[in-house]
Each structure stands twice: as C-alpha cells, then as structure tokens.
Regions:
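A broad detector of the eukaryotic-type serine/threonine protein kinase catalytic domain
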Residues: 80-81, 141, 188-189
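A well-ordered secondary-structure block
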Residues: 2-3, 31-34, 116-183, 239-302
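Signal peptide processing junction and immediate N-terminal pro/mature segment
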Residues: 22-39
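Extracytoplasmic and endomembrane cell-envelope/extracellular-matrix remodeling and assembly machinery
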Residues: 174-198, 202
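Bacterial N-terminal signal peptides
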Residues: 11-22
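Short, well-ordered surface patches within globular domains
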Residues: 37-40, 44, 48-120, 156, ...
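Intrinsic disorder/low-complexity segments in short proteins, especially the signal peptide
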Residues: 6, 16-18, 28-30
Length: 302
C-alpha cells in the first residue's frame, strides 16, 4: 500500500489566540499539520503461468483489455457498484507498467527508479484523482485472469470498490501469457477557478447560517490568490505572501481536494462575532507532495 498525499491546514492569526486540534497556529514561521492519509490499495497475483519459460514480447492486447473492462463492469453491476469508465491516459500508464513488468520478468507495483502509482497516473492523465488503486497479474487469458483476481480478496476489493469510477487497463501479450495491469481511480469533478471559489464561499456562509451569525460580506482580494499560488509554487503552507497578508487579516490556509468542504473545526473560527467580511484565494496545482493535484486555499477574514 502506498502512502497517499497529505492534506494540510494551517492558521495564521494576527491578533488573539485560537486553538484547535486540526490546525497549526503560526506567527513568524510556517509548518505542516498532521497528515490525513488517503489510501491507494494495491495487490499482486502470480499464478502458475509465471513459472513457464520466457517468451518474447509480442504486443499490447487491446482485445484482452476490452474484455477485462467488460468483465469488471459485469461484476460491479452484480455487486451494486457503478460502472468504470476507461480513461485513455490511465491506460497509457497501465500499459507502460505492464511492459515494465514484462521487461523485468516479474510482477511489481513499483520497480526501482519507477515513479509511484499516483505519480505515474498524474503524468499520464489530466483528470484529478483523490483515490488510486492497482491490481497486477500474470495469466493465460483475460477471462481466467478476471476469475483469479475475483477469488483474491484484495484484488476483488479493488475491482468492486464503489468509490472508483475510472480505470486504466494495460495488457502485454508474451506468447501464451498476459501481463495485466488494472489502475483504478476516483475522478473528481473538473471545476473552474470561479466555481471553486463559489463553493468555498458557500461553505463559509453556511457555517455562519448554522451558527446563527450575521452573513459575512464577500470581497475580492487579489493578494489572497497570489498568496494561494505562492503556496502551490513552494509546495507548502505559510509562505511569505501569506504572512504579509496576515499583517492585515486573520488568515486560514489549507489544501483540499473537495472545495465544498471546509477543514475540520473551521466553524469555530468562522462563527466569531468579530467578523464582518471574507475573501477566498485559490490556486490549483500538481506538486511533488500532491502529484494528482490539489486546491491551495487562502481564506482572509476581518
């Protein structure tokens, strides 16, 4: 199982003291909150065919890939899980990994010098994923491969995971053997920058409504966007532009995959009687810490 990208949250307070378990109080220096891990489920299956003699590489087997997709969706329908949509980029990543397994003559989720699964998928597709998983196998044909995968609990769990909605399939044929890679993911909606800001703003106003506080005025602040993009560029919270912004406002910074959801315990800060207005600054970016992308968010409050 691969460790997943962490989601960070930090709070810069100009005046007063605020304490909550899921936030980090910052003054002159930045820092990271505890990682909130998402999982990338991985499993490996090596049937008896793995011991047969090596046979030269033939080609990708698109027919086997299509059959594996159909069989997976049939099994998912029986289990009440949504259908998987084939993603061309994820399939390129799966094929490349299947060819690497053939070249190494072994099954693995990551060979020496090879990028991690999230990094491979990020390099191959433009869709934003918040979950990834992978099955690899070696078998004689696609139908038997699917049957064997379904008999293995961790592989079956990946195939039937209701959270997954996209898949990439790669099958390399080598004589009578198939090197099989199934890369699963949960693709998030593709929001415009304005939509992201609107969703965050709606969440802020909902907190005010739920806590029976007066509605905050929303204002545009270009410095908040600049601060958010500075965090994305630095791949960390608490950059110099954030601290400069914090000289004038109370600033909450965090990373998120879901703009409609505020950080845990943010309502404690947002329900303050002393607040009158807010602005939202965002920047979407793929970084080393977040290879499949994340929203960097700056909320300024006064």
């Amino acid at each position: 199982m691969l460790g997943a990208s962490k989601i960070e949250v930090a709070l810069v307070l100009v005046m007063g003291v605020f304490s909550a378990p899921s936030f980090l109080l910052m003054a002159a220096s930045g820092g990271n909150a505890d990682a909130a891990q998402k999982s990338a489920q991985q499993a490996t299956l090596r049937p008896a065919s793995a011991s047969s003699p090596d046979i030269p590489f033939s080609d990708y087997d698109s027919g086997a890939e299509q059959l594996l997709l159909e069989l997976a969706n049939q099994s998912r329908a029986q289990a009440g899980a949504p259908r998987l949509t084939l993603d061309a980029g994820m399939s390129r990543a799966a094929r490349a990994h299947a060819e690497q397994m053939f070249a190494e003559r072994q099954l693995s989720h990551q060979f020496d010098g090879e990028p991690s699964l999230p990094q491979r998928l990020a390099a191959a597709t433009s869709i934003q994923l918040d979950q990834e998983g992978e099955n690899v196998a070696l078998d004689f044909d696609a139908e038997k491969g699917h049957q064997h995968l379904m008999l293995s609990p961790p592989h079956r769990a990946n195939l039937l995971n209701p959270a997954y909605n996209v898949v990439g399939l790669g099958v390399v044929r080598s004589g009578d053997r198939l090197y099989i890679v199934q890369d699963f993911g949960h693709a998030l909606p593709n929001y415009s920058p304005a939509e992201v800001k609107d969703k965050i703003a709606a969440a802020v106003l909902q907190v005010r409504h739920d806590t029976k506080q007066p509605e905050l005025a929303r204002r545009d602040l270009s410095a908040a966007d600049a601060a958010a993009c500075s965090m994305a560029q630095a791949d960390k919270l608490g950059t110099s532009p954030v601290h400069q912004l914090a000289q004038r406002y109370t600033v909450l910074t965090y990373t998120s995959l879901h703009p409609e959801a505020l950080p845990e315990n943010a309502s404690h800060l947002l329900s303050s009687l002393n607040l009158h207005s807010f602005s939202v600054g965002t920047c979407y970016s793929r970084t080393e810490t977040y290879p499949t992308g994340v929203y960097w968010v700056v909320l300024s409050l006064d």
